[in-house]
Amino acid sequence: MSRAVHFPVPCPVLLGTLTDDSLEAQLHEYAKQGNYVKVKKILKKGVCVDAVNTLGQSALFVAALLGYVKLVDVLVDYGSDPNHRCFDGSTPVHAAAFSGNQWILSKVLTAGGDLRLHDEKGRNPQAWALAAGKDRSTQMVEFMQRCASHMKAVIQGFSYDLLKKIDSPQRLIGSPPWFGGLIQGSPNSSPNRQPKPGIISAQNIYSFGFGKFYLTSGMQLTYPGSLPVIGEKEVIQADDEPTFSFFSGPYMVMTNLVWNRSRVTVKELNLPTHPHCSRLRLADLLIAEQEHSSNLRHPSLLQLMAVCLSRDLEKIRLVYERITVGTLFSVLHERRSQFPVLHMEMIVHLLLQIADALIYLHSRGFIHRSLSSYAVHIVSAGEARLTNLEYMMESQDSGAHRDMTRVPLPAQLYNWAAPEVVLQKTATVKSDIYSFSMIIQEILTDNIPWNGLDGSLVKETIALGNYLEADVRLPEPYYDIVKSGIHAKQKNRTMNLQDIRYILKNDLKEFIGAQKTQTTESPRGQRYEPHPDINICLGLTSEYQKDPPDLDIKELKETGSQPHSPTDHSFLTEKTLAPQTLDSSLSAQEPDNPNVPSASRLAEEVRSPTPSEASLYSFEINEIYSGCLTLGTDKEEECPGTASSPEGDKANQVDELPSLEEELDKMERELHCFCEEDKSFSDVDTDLSFEDGDWQSDSLSSLSLPEPTREAKGKTSSWSKTDEYVSKCVLNLKISQVMMQQSAEWLRKLEQEVDELEWAQKELDNQCRSLWDASLRFANTKFLSAVGPPSLTYLPPVMQLSEPKQPENGGNWLTLARPPGNERDFQEGNFSKKSEKLSACDWNPFTQASEESRGYCSEPNNQPPTLCGPGKQNTGEQLPSTEEAKESLERNTNQNIRRMESVSSEVCDTKSRNNEDAGEARSKWRLAVKEMAEKAVSGQLLVPPWNLQSSFESKVENESTPLPRPPIRGPESTDWQYILEYQREKDELKGNMKFGKMENSDCDKNKHSSWTGLQRFTSIIYPFFRNHEQPEHNEASQASCDTXCGEKFYSTSSPIEDDFERIQSSFAQPQGYVEENFQIREIFGKNAEILTKPQFQAVQCAEDEQEETLEETPKELKEKNISLTDIQDLSSITYEQDGCFKETSCKTPKLKHAPTSASTPLSPESISSAASHYEDCLENTFHVKRGSTFCWNGQEAMRTLSTKFTTVRERAKSLESLLASSKTLPAKLTDPKRLCMFGGACSSNISTAFVTSTHSTKRKSLPGELAEATSQHHIDELPPPAQELLDEIEQLKQQQVSSMVSLENTAHDLNVTENDKKHLEEQETNSSKDSSFLSSREIQDLEDTERAHSSLDEDLERLLQLPEENMTLLDPTKGSTREKKTKDQDMVEQKRKKKEGIKPERRKSDSFLGTLEEDELKPCFWKRLGWSEPSRIIVLDQSDLSD
């Protein structure tokens, strides 16, 4: 006896045992020891070679797992099954793969082993081989790959001589996957000599692990049973028919395709799987069905025609004969509308075919186990086939049953399965009888067994001891069959399939005999009525046969007879009903024959069917057919002795038909009402139609009783026609029932859609309500009035331009680096009017002053963004002289005026709110200017305690959505799109704004969009300023640039600033932004109020400024009177406070530039040190303007730059030339090559120096009193300056003087150089220290400033005439009026200047020195500053620098 080999570790399975002393136990014991001699002796005694142990393992499995080569040879020679399934689903092929021995695996494969099978965990033999370890798995996996490659080569049609050279897997042992030659020899090969070719496969049967196959005489590769093996490309979709698929059980799907010009149905697995999925084992079901179907042949079994293999050989598809209708389950429960009536003859015929197929399977030793209505396939009308053999078991001689897959029955089939199958006990022939009885009950009651209960619940119910009983509604003899067949215990199922088939055949014979004879002496024959065509009851699919049923029904309507009836007058009677009996209606005859339900009762049942009644409609209709025939016999017995004659028959028919016609008309009206309701549902769901029910509706609408046929010799039976009419009524009622069920389903779907719509409407209402509540929260808030011209008296003129022309290029507006949506937002929103919603919140709309200021381009501007003046274009690299600048300015202004005329006219047409003529507007304007000037010189103007920031605060609070920020640069602006989209959605929801258009007609927008656009536009410089104002917080400051910051429009020194910042941050800033504000505030002290606020603001068009700064209700105007900013807008007097410029706007009809900054000269003395300081600040501003291209409006930029070049110098005689050259500088700045977008244009140092130096400039450009107060205010806050800083200041002055001299003489490149950046960084320190020593020289500075300003009166007045001349080009008449008005104002002011004296300077300085921060909040504070004194108004600065 051979020595036992140790069990390989790790092993995926355990080995079972047998403890008795039987031969099977000895077989397994010797198999474990590897003693093939003793095994051979035991097998000779007749022991089953596939006897299993406690784990379902055969001796071959044990030998292959332990690696006994000789023992495997013996067991295979004795016929052991290589695909035997253990209880865990594994096979000897799995065991051989795990052993690592190629010879053992080759022997198992040669015997028919399959490499595609899976165990219960979804593992195939290759997975078992990999589990054995790398040292043993490498050669084994390569061997399996060679077998697969060889099989592929054979399928793809390579030379079949290859099969003669390599006819078994043994010849692939140790061979590379090369098929021209053969390299033999392997350490794992068999000790025996290799067999010669042809010895193993003498019968041309081959197996390489993918099923047994052989070559026919025509060299066709086939499986046993002559099943062709085809490729997946050979099965295609037919061109002349639609795709038709249906489910054949829980896992399989059937599809109608074409193979080799034959119409077939292909079965495949329809279950998504993934690698290492346990559901991969379900693929074994197709292999098992292929095995069974290829070995079984019967007319009632679905014929397997071919096997389709995939390219990777892993998936197979089974090619069956064409199935036209589908499964019985789909006909009964899924597509019943296509088959409304199943007659008894059809039902019996189908049941007989299924019984024949089951009898054949049982005779071959197979048990179907999974018989259900899914397994019954109706291939054509009246022809059924049994399939789904994948769960079939084979009973052997020893009484054991062989399951090829070990896949448990799916729970979906428990409704038909026998209790022993559900509980996974041993299945027998009685199990199939139980399932067949379930099908009989299902087809007669239209109910799924167990009333459609879920399979898992069915199993629980059976486990608890509950079982089904036969339905009492079943007719005889089917009730007896079902009652006997569904007993819980198998021994009580006394009726076998032969007995059931005998009963069914007898019933069918009686039915057929009744069709042929139809005699009154045969009550059993009268139980059935012959149907006109079997296709009417069970037609084909809707694609193929729709016309034959229609034809038959029409034929039935027209003739009133059965088309396929043997005779039209088969009833030969001499007795007819009495006339009085014929007069009664069908409903009155109901008590006489309770078996025949009346038409009215049937209609009532259709209207309100119960679940139990609905399942029996098919059976009841068939009973009605037979019952109607027995009605005649019963009546004959009731009325004996009634005479009969042809004339009597005719008279009786004439009397009977009207009463029947009344009943039919009543049903027809009811069905018409139903059809009308049904049409309304077809409007909702257009996909649904009554294709199969159209002919029934037609028959109802055109139902008319034909004239009784006149047949010779009086052989026509009156009841035959009555039966026909009743049968048609019953058919129509059944159709109506189905249609009503469909309509109920459509109604349910419609109600669901309506509910969804209502829910969506509720959500929308809730959102609108929340937004409305948010807007009403600030509805009663009292806002401060806007500072500006009196809106009660001023109305802008309506200007009609003579040359409307579409602008070709919009170079007048600076284009920011913003997203397209923001660009449109700014262009549309900032030229918009107020909406009604905001008007309700005390926001008073203000009409735009000048339509010319709306001159933005209506077409997309593809030009680079420029900093042009009004119409100013790039005039070259050199700075021209004064005269050339004037000529160039006039030419370019004319060009741009012509461009803007068409836009202005269109905007005027769409946005102007009044139609007053220009003359009346100018007269009102002139009166308003004079009134304001009188109040100013008399000291009657009132000043609010602080700036109008609080009004904007309230307005920010009114907004329900956060204001988006303008984009910064690079990746920092990535979330701009999301913010903008959110803003768009909210705006569109509230009806405030309409995005997506840039035409001039879209200018009429609301106030909300104007405010939003202004916030976006005015918040562009602040991040740069904050980023570099505090170098040690560079990183945090840079992060703050990504946030959307709502900017303050005016600077304030009031105590409410902190509160306002917090409120505004809650709307527009993240938390990090607020924290950083306070960090900077802690470092810089109180001065951080100025440092952390935006010091400059992008200049916008006059309309934006007019809307945002001049919002004031009439009531507030009366209460608050007029403030100083009104005077600034009207007469160019700058109202400045706390070292900050304001965003102001010019309201004159003919000017588009912003109001100019002004100063008040005192005495014409020589230039002093104060002028020098003023000059330094202007030079700093010049440097910054030369180096940065912030977002200034074209016109504003020209005036800003031109006036910033105005420097108070000792050489007063060269002032005019200096100013003329400086006015041409903007042309240099507008060069597209040198212009930078906002996002990356300016360096941090330039931005810092620009803000800081201009802050100093603003303080020094104030009137003397304001400068003194401001400087004194900051002296207390700033630390004393260091000596080294003072030295640097003196050095900077000298450098700036030299740089200004070079600028006066030559026009050089205005790009910022590294030297300029260095100067600007140093100047930041200089400007921060100016306020510290300004107070010590304050009195002298004020006197010098007065003398400097007086000396330049005439020159600056000439400079001011340039904008007037430019605007005159738009309208010469109006331009002269404006010029005259300006001169008149100057004359009035000069006279008042002479009449009234200037108060002593001591009083002003004292008032400044004595002013506290709390006093600034009082309205009388500004009167104490000297603003009530008469002043001479001239212009030094036309820039509109704002926050």
UniProtKB/Swiss-Prot annotation:
One of this protein's Pfam families, by short name?
Ank_2
What's in the keyword line of the UniProt record? ANK repeat, ATP-binding, Cell cycle, Cell division, Centromere, Chromosome, Cytoplasm, Kinetochore, Mitosis, Nucleotide-binding, Phosphoprotein, Repeat
Polar residues compositional bias: what residue ranges?
A: 559-570, 578-598, 872-881, 1325-1337
Under the GO molecular function aspect, what terms does this record hold? Answer: ATP binding; protein kinase activity; protein kinase binding
Q: Name the residue ranges of motif: D-box.
A: 886-894
SMART domains the record matches: ANK (SM00248)
Q: Motif GPPX3Y: where?
A: 788-794
Q: Where is this region: Disordered?
A: 547-614, 635-654, 852-886, 902-922, 1253-1273, 1318-1410
In this chain the Protein kinase domain maps to 199-512
Q: What does the entry list under GO cellular component? A: cytoplasm; intercellular bridge; kinetochore; midbody
Q: Is this entry keyworded Nucleotide-binding?
A: yes
Q: Give the Phosphoserine positions (modified residues).
A: 175, 186, 431, 561, 659, 1054, 1214, 1350-1351, 1405, 1442
ANK repeats sit at 27-54, 55-84, 88-117
Q: Which InterPro entries match?
A: Ankyrin_rpt, Ankyrin_rpt-contain_sf, Kinase-like_dom_sf, Prot_kinase_dom, Ser-Thr/Tyr_kinase_cat_dom, Tex14
Main location class: cytoplasm
Where does it localize?
Cytoplasm; Midbody; Chromosome, Centromere, Kinetochore
What Gene Ontology terms for biological process does this UniProt record contain? attachment of spindle microtubules to kinetochore; cell division; cellular response to leukemia inhibitory factor; intercellular bridge organization; male meiotic nuclear division; mitotic sister chromatid separation; mitotic spindle assembly checkpoint signaling; negative regulation of cytokinesis
Q: Which family does it belong to?
A: Belongs to the protein kinase superfamily.
Please state what the protein is called. Inactive serine/threonine-protein kinase TEX14
Give the species.
Rattus norvegicus
Its lineage reads:
Eukaryota, Metazoa, Chordata, Craniata, Vertebrata
